[in-house]
């Protein structure tokens, strides 16, 4: 949850609300319970995404594995994002922290070859894709998806 767009300009510097920070922390605690091992956390350079990535990295004790990439900014295309991810192809498990509709578009493209395949991630949601090599259309298999509420329930 970010502060109101109308009251915060420029959008790149718009932070999470105190409620949003609390929710992300609980979701990160739920993520920790899954015992996933991330090689890298890639984040959008926008403030609210950076805050989210930092909270997750702290909870998972992965602060040294955070990298910001412009290709996760909301004004980028799915093609830009996938090109940016190619630089990290040697990494096995990467957590992406970005924005909608870019992330849903990328997931849709990787699963179906189309960016509008009705895949929708909620703010703070998470999905796991298994990729076969460098990201290309129809190269992924969805392993699981969790809504933010499910992650928060795992934290209990």
Stretches found by the model and what they are:
Residues 111-141, 145-148:
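Domain-level recognition of soluble alpha/beta enzyme cores
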